[in-house]
Amino acid sequence: MKAYVAVDIGASSGRLMLGQLEDGKLKLQEMHRFKNGFEFKNNHDRWNIDYLIDEIFKGLEKIKESGYTEVSLGIDTWAVDYVLVGKDGKKLQDPISYRDKRTSNSINELTTEVSKEYIYKKTGIQFLNFNTLYQLFEEDKELLKKTDKIMMIPDYIGYILTGKAVTEITNASTTQMLSLREGLFDKNLLEKVNVSSDQFAKLVDAGTVLGNLKEDWYSKYELPKVNVVTVATHDTASAVIGTPCEGQHWAYLSSGTWSLIGTELNIPENGAKVFKENYTNEWGAYGTYRFLKNIMGLWMAQCVKKELNDQYSFSELAELAGEVEPFEQFINVNDQRFQNPGNMIQEIQTYCRETGQKVPETPGEIMMAIYSNLALFYANEISKLDDIMGYHIDTLNIVGGGSNVALMNQLTSTIANVDVYAGPSEATAIGNILVQMITAGDVLNVYLGRRIISNSFDIKHYTPEQGKYSKVLAEYQQFLNKERG
């Protein structure tokens, strides 16, 4: 029985998941888990990329110890961040995190040189101040001159493992430098940030085989034979592949540190209406586009948990929230002030004071403020999707860690008036593995793969509670409009 390993690294944790097809069902087991996070070093918030690679090898050693002698392996991580690699093939610095404050005003600065309309028409990508385009705009110019290759995080990890450099297209699209239809980097945008297309390795599709690990690794670690496949390396792209896609007019919500809500298209949408709403057209696997909005996710809850000294689990925090009435205050969860505050609890409380609302004090009140306002924001985005697509989204497929938060899922279903199918929580790893299986010929296509997912995992169904909170979405929309002036 073939074994497939997903290296799935998010902003707060990473894992190695092993998947196998057994009697038409995908069996998934976690082989290794580790923490992730940035640290302030050399004047910036940076990722410890060497630590992440070391943890991958620890996981592979565990897999070998478990009796697996040969595996396929794919790597996905968060998007937009990159590693600068010199001519000697070594990194020039530890990669800077997208949450670093260096790009806080970069959109305004860069768009004095090139218009927003040009950028959006060319790339179709949502304006976010941490996109790779703006990070490179703020990058050390002398360091860029020494750079031979600019590698996205998962591409760099694949390069270290195999010695082969590529630029996988689903992640490349998140840079806001990739041409929407040609699938090539836009030279005008590259020039504005002092880089050239030669500084990126060859663009490849998901499902490209990189091959075996470098021999040096086998002398250093006790490893199985590993065949590396370039999957949909942006974790959201993998998560969408791993979404069951229940319903006729469906949308997805990849609910983790970030919330990514949208639908899957065969033809991108980058007209005036979607430009105004700041939607993105990220490339998906197999010729699709992920039409979505990138908004705040469980990052707020993760920060609160940490600030409470981890004395509560997420399930315990959800229980405490369930004892509190929802919608006691309205919060624009996408406000930039919540992106990387010194203290999330204090930031939420200050926001409520400044807007003249009830201030949440207890852990339960704070968590309910987060969950209920995330649900409101999701419902608001679904109403925008309805308008853009010209039909009512009737089903929302929630995957990722947030699919386990029943309270938030039920509120979302009721407020948005949609059926919610929650799960699987490990959709990213599943989508990663599914691309490997398609590449190997074990699964014919994504459609059949999604049917396997539906039959393999527990998917919870939530339906709207009729008559509850019927006016709250309109009130929240009025609040957002007033706040934005």
UniProtKB/Swiss-Prot annotation:
Key words, A-Z: ATP-binding, Kinase, Magnesium, Nucleotide-binding, Plasmid, Rhamnose metabolism, Transferase
Cofactor(s) needed for function: Mg(2+)
An annotated GO BP: rhamnose catabolic process
Keyword match Lipid metabolism: no
Pathway linked to the protein: Carbohydrate degradation; L-rhamnose degradation; glycerone phosphate from L-rhamnose: step 2/3
Domain of life: Bacteria
EC number(s) recorded for this UniProt protein: 2.7.1.5
Protein function: Involved in the catabolism of L-rhamnose (6-deoxy-L-mannose). Catalyzes the transfer of the gamma-phosphate group from ATP to the 1-hydroxyl group of L-rhamnulose to yield L-rhamnulose 1-phosphate.
NCBIfam families: rhamnulo_kin
Protein known as: Rhamnulokinase
Annotated organism of origin: Ligilactobacillus salivarius (strain UCC118)
